[in-house]
Amino acid sequence: FKVKNSIVDIAMFNGESKAFEIKTELDTPHRLNGQICDYTRLFQKCYIVIPEEKLYNYINYIGPNVGIILLKYVKRHIELYEYREAVSNANIDPEMVMSCLRTEEYKNIVNTFYGAIPDVNDFQMYDICKQQISNIPASNLQKLFLKEIEKRKNCSKLLNVVPNVVRQICLSMNLNKKTIDILIKKLNEPLI
C-alpha cells in the first residue's frame, strides 16, 4: 500500500487502519522517520516490527505513539510479541486520503457525506472532490476512508496466476475473477 513516498510493508484495514513497517537485521533506521511520518498521516495505528536485539537501535527514532512488535527467535521458529501498543491517531490528512483512493472511492466518500457528487466535468472532479473531502471532519473521514478501502477485493491468490506484466493492469482496473479468467484465456490463445 503506497503512502506518499513510502510503501507500507503490511497494511491492515479491519475495523481500523494499521500500518506495519518491518525491519530486519540488515536494515538501518535512517528512512524510518520519513516512513512513520507518512503512515501517521493516514493510518490510525502504526507499528514497527523489529528483531528483539535491534530494539535499542530503533527506539530513539520513533515517537511514543508508534507501537513496537519484537521478533524473537526461539528454537528454530519466530515468536512475535507486542513490546509497546500503538496509540490511536485521531488525525487523517485529506490530501493523503485522496492520493490513496481510486476515482470511484473518493466519489463514494463525497456522495456519502454530502449526499451528492459534484456536477462538474471529469477534469474538475478530482479538485472539487479533494476540496470537499478536506472539509469533512477527521473522525468522519477516517470512517468513510476505512469503509471504502474495506470494499476492495483481496484477489492476491487470483493474481498469482496472472503474468507479472499484466498484474498491474488487473489491479488498477479492479478486475473481477471472471474478467481475469477471460483475460488469461485470451492471452494464452494463438495470435493467428
What do the PLM-derived regions correspond to, one by one?
Residues 13-15, 72-76:
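Short acidic-glycine loop/turn motifs at beta-strand connectors
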Residues 77-152:
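A conserved mid-domain beta-alpha-beta active-site/ligand-binding segment of alpha/beta enzyme cores
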Residues 26-72:
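Catalytic cores of nucleic-acid endonucleases
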Residues 128-192:
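C-terminal, charge/polar-rich interaction regions
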Residues 10-26:
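Conserved catalytic cores of phosphodiester-cleaving nucleases, focusing on short active-site segments
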Residues 1-12:
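N-terminal, Lys/Arg-enriched amphipathic/low-complexity engagement segments
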Residues 6, 16, 32-35:
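Generic hydrophobic, aliphatic-rich segments that mediate packing or membrane embedding
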